[in-house]
């Protein structure tokens, strides 16, 4: 006696469910956009390791790829990627995947600050170079080892990520296809 069509179908469903729950999660891409003062903005892309996607808070150690591009009035002024990191590069990142939030507003180096190729003084991004900092004084950018005061905004301004890319003016773009 062979299996009935219903039994085969049920077995397929059970196997599919088992595979779905035992198949490891894949890495996830997140998109970043920041609007500063005086026409400064930043877009970026971050990839988290599969093991980090479900964590409450991830750090720079969980990031497998990262790139930011800086703009002034929509014109590219610089960029930085994790591939350019050296032993002297400032690289501090905190991110909450569930809320798509980068914690900001705290002392530099704390759990609520960011340093993407820019330290707390925003003066170590390289020459040529570009970086972003969020601490307790402001959120701002560094260009060619120089703090760009004009870019500064309130340190508590929310910094969110998206699952879709942003345009230069921080409008989420709907992927085609």
State each model region's role:
Residues 5, 17, 39-41:
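N-terminal start-of-chain detector that recognizes signal peptides
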Residues 21-27:
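Sec/Tat signal peptide C-region and signal peptidase I cleavage site
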Residues 28-177:
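An extracellular/secretory-lumen and virion-surface interaction module
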